[in-house]
Amino acid sequence: TIGKGYGYQVAKKVYDSKLSDDKIDQIDNILENLILDPTNRRLLINLFNIDDLSEMNLAPCAYETFFMVEYLEDNYGIVRPKLNVVLNQRSGDFIVAAHPGGWNEFQYYFLYRLIADLIGFELGTFIHNTYNLHLYNRHIDIVDNILEVEEVDMYHFIKAPFETKEEIRKEINNT
């Protein structure tokens, strides 16, 4: 097991709830603050707890997630909150976890989507910083195989925002 890393740090009840007399974990703290004080500059989850490092089998690689809310006016003049996230990762194995669309990015993007949906905010920008992205020698053959595969258009992104319903229908019919 990873010991006192990742899930243990997230689930540790260290914050005083603003809604009850209970202690809450890092996720509940983010949710509470997004509801009560969405412009708070302390909306972060930090897994790098120096006091517990000796009891972690691996120091957290993806160690910090910072949430920011911005209020933007849409094409209809309605101001809507958008949730932005920055994921900071100290170290990342390219093949296993840290490549674009990899395991780490997927996990944190899923968390981002879940929190935005729970609070009712639109998605803004998701940024993933990896400070030491590396490829191990044992994975070079895998990378060679990946590079030989022809490019496949796996995703189709719908442009937004649209000016008219007709543009939306046209784009949907083109997918």
Residue ranges, per PLM feature:
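Terminal, non-catalytic protein-protein interaction segments that mediate quaternary/complex assembly
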Residues: 1-175
